[in-house]
Amino acid sequence: MNEYTDIMKNLFLPVLLVAGSFFVSCTSSVFTPTPSANSWDDNYLSVAKMEDYRQWGTYNVHDPSCRKLGDYYYMYSTDAIFGENRKEAREKGVPLGFIQMRRSKDLVHWEFLGWAFPEIPEEAVQWVQSHAGGQGATIIMAPYIIPYKDKYRLYYCVSAFGRKTSYIGLAESTSPEGPWTQKGCIVKTDDSTAMNAIDPSVIADENTGKWWMHYGSFFGGLYCVELNPETGLALNEGDLGHLVARRANYRKDNLEAPEIIYHPELKQYYLFTSYDPLMTTYNVRVSRSDAAEGPFTDYFGKAVKDTTNNFPILTAPSSF
């Protein structure tokens, strides 16, 4: 059974999405969630100081990649921290790095493990800043974890905000907790390309054994590139892949963050995507295909490469 099917079932019904290493000097206590009287006011100021990182639990989790690996569920997430202060972190000896790592045995109580990387990989920084006027490459976003044989592959992206100047890289380890070794670049884009190299999601086709990486956000739509299973890198160096999904007007009709999973009972691949502006009508939609690389169609059989809207809508602001 696919790793995600323990978490996600009946994919056209209401869906629950649970969605060198740089470790903390000692293990953190397991976080126990507490209810808030008003979730809109829940800003977790009580544990927002940099020295409180062992108490973060699920606080400061953005764009998580979660998978059952051995006895634990492991979760990796974007470098976005409420009240982040790297100067304060250095002064107080906080080992602040990049890509937060957590683990849990029940998906409720989470232990903060630390950060995967001590620094943003230099190759990614050079690519982004040299193509964005010295801007960008300040955080690592949207990591994705997947096992292969006796290794664990951690995909990640570095970008310049609001531009197509981006880089998706790969690190490997023999443990889901690291340490991580940089393996290289999968795809990189700039203002001259149609697509944007962020938000990777990787899957192996159950029938062909081929590996595919879906990626992209905003500009130009979502794309899919074939990977070499043995290396985890692009099968053909420099290949940016083929178009999978798009919308008509990216200034108002946003499309981002593909997530591809396989449903073994239905023998189909489901592509979850985020639609519309983050701060207003943000929502999640899903399409499906008989092949991991597509083509994908919506509930009504309409191709998601079409520029009109696709359905169904699974989640929306304050709705499920």
Question: Positions of the model-derived regions?
Answer:
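Carbohydrate-active catalytic/glycan-binding domains of CAZyme proteins
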Residues: 26-320
